[in-house]
Curated annotation (Swiss-Prot):
Function per UniProt: Component of the FERRY complex (Five-subunit Endosomal Rab5 and RNA/ribosome intermediary). The FERRY complex directly interacts with mRNAs and RAB5A, and functions as a RAB5A effector involved in the localization and the distribution of specific mRNAs most likely by mediating their endosomal transport. The complex recruits mRNAs and ribosomes to early endosomes through direct mRNA-interaction. Putative regulator of protein phosphatase 1 (PP1) activity. May play a role in the endosomal sorting process or in endosome maturation pathway.
Keywords: Coiled coil, Endosome, RNA-binding
GO molecular function ontology, one term from the record: RNA binding
SMART domains, per the entry: KLRAQ
GO terms for cellular component: early endosome; membrane
Source superkingdom: Eukaryota
Pfam families per the UniProt record, alphabetical: KLRAQ, PPP1R21_C, PPP1R21_helical
Protein name from the UniProt record: Protein phosphatase 1 regulatory subunit 21
Listed PANTHER family: PROTEIN PHOSPHATASE 1 REGULATORY SUBUNIT 21, SMOOTH MUSCLE MYOSIN HEAVY CHAIN-RELATED
Signal peptide extent: none
Domain comment (free text): Coiled-coil domains of PPP1R21 are essential for RNA binding.
InterPro entries hit by this protein: PPP1R21, PPP1R21_C, PPP1R21_N, PPP1R21_six_helix
Organism, as annotated: Xenopus laevis (African clawed frog)
Amino acid sequence: MATGDLQGKYQKLAQEYSKLRAQNQVLKRAVVDEQANGTALKEQLKMKDQSLRKQQQEMDSLTFRNQQLAKRVELLQDELSLMDVKGKKTKKNMDTSQLSQEQKSVFDEDLQKKIEENERLHIQFFEASETHRQMESELTSRLQELETNTAQHQAVVDGLTQKYMDTIEKLQGDKAKLEVKCQALEREAKDCRLRTEDCQNQLKTLHTDLSSRLDDSLVIINEKLPFNDTRTSQLNALNVPVHNKRYQLKARELANQGLSFVRDLVTALLNFHTYTEQRVQIFPIDSAIDVVSPLNKKFSEYLHENASYVRPLEDGMLQLFESITEDTVTVLETAVKLKIFSENFSSYVCFLQKILPYQLKSLEEESEFSSGTSALRSRNQELHKDMQKITAVFDKLKTYITLLALPSTKPEGLLRTNYGTILTQISEALHRLHDISQELSKHYNNKAALEQELPAATDKLKTTNDCVLSSLAALTNVTSKIATFFGNNLDYFISSLSYGPKGGRGFTNPLSAETMLVYKKKAAQYMNNLRKPCPASVPYEEALVNRRVLLSSTESREGLAQQVQQSLEKIGKLEQEKEHWMLEAQLSKIKLEKETLRIAALIKGTEKGQLPEVPHDNALLLDAGEHGKGNSTETKSTSLIGMLTVTIEDLQAPDHDSREELIKNHYMTRIAELTTHLQQADSKAVHLYAECRALAKRLTLSDKSNRSLTEETKYSVQSISKLQDELITTKRSYEDQLSMMSDHLCVMNETLSKQREEIDTLKMANKGNSKKNKMR
């Protein structure tokens, strides 16, 4: 199922990508057209600049020609003045004066013509410069507008390309993830195949074993239980039936599937009635603009109450599903909750019958609407018939479901022989409901297609029609599922009615079912008492591994214990040697002090001139100091604290009290050291106990934090689901924005075509003006 969902999502993403790619191509074409228009306008501007330069050159040439003519006129005037002076002086040359007068008149005429021509050229140049200036200003303003539009379009195209690249990368990543998941699923499929093969082999072995056991048990039953008499059906009705757990599990599974189908049916009916209410508020008269007719107003009020009739269907089916458990017996006589579902279904059918006249009148009102065509009227007639048919089918289903609910409340109200007939009639009615809903969806689709062509059709009406069509498609789908489900399980429903005591006619009332359940509980309790729990065992391979680990650990433990014992013995010996050498050092200190005192006394005696008598012990000490310790005999004294070696000379020494005092001091210091060690050990134990308590507190805190983290993970999962819903909504909004952008691009293309037409008309007008100027 996960791979199917992922493939469906991937296909949706691919479709969205293809749509976005097509829109991107449209945007690119529009941008290319804008760029072409911009280049054409730039070329036109260049041509206008060239024509302006030519006219300026002509103007310069004309001004130069005018200056030349003015100079020539001045020269001619000078010549005329000279000729006049000569004519006054000489009256002889009359003929020449006449000739000069004729030349002067000719020059005057020529000058007048040149002046008129110059004036006409000035006027033409001024008009041409004015028209050119106006054209240049208009074209520059249009060029700026087009450049801004092209920049905007380029920004939109860049943003869309970036978005498409991101979507492509995301799709590629999703594709890689899907490939990895497919590989993992293929591996799991291989493992599952191997497991199924093993399970099939085990099933075969178990089947053979159980079949042999069944044969043996049947032989024993036939031999050992000949007293069971099942000939008289009246007495067999008193038999306690056997509880079939497999039958109950199958019934619960079918009830669960029926509950899911009823939920889908409830959602489809809710959507259909809700969208029908919205359509009545919009067409043929929009409630936001004008007052709706009283018929449609009443019809919309009734449709607004659809949830109170439709949702109880799901509640009744849910109660029926919850009443079917492993510890119950499910037949028509014990299915008490079926009565609730029957009552809810009857109330919904009454609701359909109540709104049917209003729905038919509403269709007639739509047909009488002024903008309705003959085809639309025929579609309304088809819907008129379909609504009557679907209400009749629901009424038929209500009758059969009410009959099925009778055995649980009134067993005498329905004969047991009619159960199978009623179930087959329900199956046929469900198939008929699917066919009628399919025809209704088809006819409504044709009607919606005709209504979209009407001039009075608004966007709100189109979207509402799409919603109604989607709800009808969902209704058709769920009715087909229910019909196929009921048809496939019809044999099971009919065969399950024979579930009852052995040799009997079935359940007559729910008391036998309760008795059977009581005996079942007693039998289960008896078997639990007989069954002794097996001692907990360990698998053989795991036991071998544990034995190896145990042997290795015991060997290592023994070796470590020996090492510890040896190290403890070494430590004891070293401590004894330490004590011995410490006592030796103290005795040597005492001897040194005595020798120093004796030497001091000898020095004093020598100073006085007397040689004191050396005692025997001191002589022996001197001999021992001179000859060494080789001849002296030693005695060893060993205690728990240490070992003490004392020579005979030391024992014979007169200062026993001082030696005992030293030994006492040594032992006291040793006891003090041991007490300090003991106190340190106690403090360490207290510290370890505090650490253990702290660790216990940390463990409790970690448990609390773990619980809080699990709650946070639940909240995070909920937030992830919310974010996924927000992602879906944002995706839909982006799709709407893209559709709006495509519409905007279409409008921009239309405006660009209009601008092209205007530019062409201006070109034609410019050409006509230029021709008129040339004609002038």
